[in-house]
């Protein structure tokens, strides 16, 4: 199956180009909130749909199986975005959805992290905290355990992402040296300074947080906590960018990866400056993962083109004029 068409003329005249959009927190294994084993064919279709929407890089943050890792091998690179992926997520007993992910026994985090790093495609994912009935989100791992996981991942050149919605866990994870904070509702100024100093990532997934608030109800204890967290996110966005953090757009399960532009637009609506929004949905993801960016001779022939300057109007991100992958136009 050939998904490409050769350009008959120069389509770039009068258009604005980015190297591609980035989804920094995706779950391609399933197309929604159904917590089931992954669907390889469905994941391939979602990846193709994302490419058609201008997505050039996906950081998949894990599932209950290795569907997305297998996808990377199954689908030729020219027919999908670049993909890095965690494999099976790591948690503890009662620390995530029942039966989802691998439970880490006390004292075994280093071994489990090493296994996860070997199975994944560049990442491991830890569920840093999870709500317990009547208590709210509780830390699943001690800070020393997080440090062990980071050390084990480093030995295999893998990065570590940590899910966190609790108050204390973002600071623990940052001090432990993790590479990416997922959600991170309660990051502090000290956290973003430390994270930025090492070029770490933060993927706030605002649309997912707002969807969860709606599901829980704004007056519930969980809803109130997340509302407070989203307000903290708004207050930290500019500080994080200034500190050098790679703030990235991420869809999670709220929307599809092909809709990642909606997350960028939401960040803009929440007060993030337009240039920073464009960085978050494009350039920063490539830089954070060590990929070349730019359009100099010899650079990768990948681009998403827009009829308006996205810095002047971020809403145009949702309506690309053309997408180029490896020198060919996506049809």
Give the residues covered by each predicted segment.
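Histidine-rich, glycine-flanked metal-binding segment
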Residues: 1-19
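Metal-associated gating/positioning segment near the N- to mid-region
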Residues: 15-77, 94-99
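Active-site gating/metal-coordination segments in enzymes
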Residues: 94-147
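Active-site core of metal-dependent hydrolases
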Residues: 133-234, 242-248, 253-255
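His/Asp/Glu-enriched, well-ordered alpha-helical/loop segment
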Residues: 155, 230-309
């Amino acid at each position: 199956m050939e998904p490409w068409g050769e350009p008959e003329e120069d389509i770039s005249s009068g258009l604005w180009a980015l190297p591609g959009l980035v989804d920094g927190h995706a779950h391609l294994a399933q197309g929604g909130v159904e917590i089931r084993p992954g669907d390889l064919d469905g994941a391939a279709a979602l990846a193709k749909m994302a490419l058609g929407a201008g997505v050039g890089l996906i950081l998949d943050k894990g599932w209950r199986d290795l569907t997305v890792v297998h996808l990377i091998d199954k689908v030729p690179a020219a027919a999908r975005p670049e993909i890095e992926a965690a494999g099976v997520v790591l948690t503890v007993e009662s620390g995530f959805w029942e039966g989802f992910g691998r439970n880490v026994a006390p004292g075994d985090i280093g071994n489990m992290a090493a296994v996860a790093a070997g199975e994944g495609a560049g990442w491991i994912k830890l569920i840093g905290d999870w709500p317990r009935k009547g208590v709210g989100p509780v830390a699943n791992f001690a800070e020393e355990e997080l440090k062990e996981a980071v050390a084990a991942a480093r030995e295999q050149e893998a990065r570590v992402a940590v899910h966190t919605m609790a108050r204390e866990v973002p600071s623990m994870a940052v001090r432990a040296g993790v590479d990416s904070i997922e959600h991170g509702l309660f990051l502090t100024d000290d956290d973003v300074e430390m994270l930025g100093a090492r070029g770490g990532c933060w993927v706030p997934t605002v649309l997912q947080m707002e969807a969860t608030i709606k599901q829980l109800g704004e007056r519930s204890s969980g809803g109130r906590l997340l509302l407070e967290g989203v307000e903290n996110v708004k207050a930290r966005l500019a500080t994080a960018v200034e500190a050098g953090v790679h703030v990235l757009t991420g869809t999670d399960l709220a929307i599809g990866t092909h809709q990642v532009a909606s997350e960028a637009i939401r960040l803009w609506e929440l007060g993030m400056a337009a240039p920073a929004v464009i960085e978050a949905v494009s350039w920063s993801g490539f830089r954070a993962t060590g990929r070349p960016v730019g359009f100099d001779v010899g650079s990768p022939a990948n681009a998403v083109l827009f009829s308006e300057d996205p810095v002047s109007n971020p809403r145009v991100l949702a309506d690309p004029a053309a997408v180029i992958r490896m020198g060919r136009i996506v049809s």
